[in-house]
């Protein structure tokens, strides 16, 4: 999980970070969520979205932080329109 991560801002005020892809256009990341037992294979961008959604959700619940809740739903709205929506939702479910 090292390397360079890029920050993306969304038109709706949301934001996420994603690992910079290698030169290989077909690069995929395999994520496993031990909390729900789900596994998904996705692009670096989708992996970043999923990782940020899980992080925002964790902090929103644990810290009862309204700002994190807002960030979560802004990014989730974006993720629902993403071409890899199914994989993202499977891993965060």
Where are the regions that the model predicts?
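Amphipathic, interaction-prone secondary-structure segments
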Residues: 1-26
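Polybasic, proline/glycine-rich intrinsically disordered low-complexity segments
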Residues: 24-93
């Amino acid at each position: 999980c090292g390397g360079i991560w890029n920050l993306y801002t969304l038109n709706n005020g949301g934001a996420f970070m994603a690992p910079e892809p290698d030169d290989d256009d077909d690069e995929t990341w395999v994520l496993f969520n031990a909390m729900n037992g789900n596994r998904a294979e996705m692009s670096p961008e989708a992996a970043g979205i999923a990782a940020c959604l899980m992080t925002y959700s964790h902090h929103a619940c644990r810290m009862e932080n309204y700002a994190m809740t807002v960030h979560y739903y802004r990014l989730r709205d974006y993720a629902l329109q993403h071409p890899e929506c199914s994989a993202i939702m499977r891993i965060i479910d």
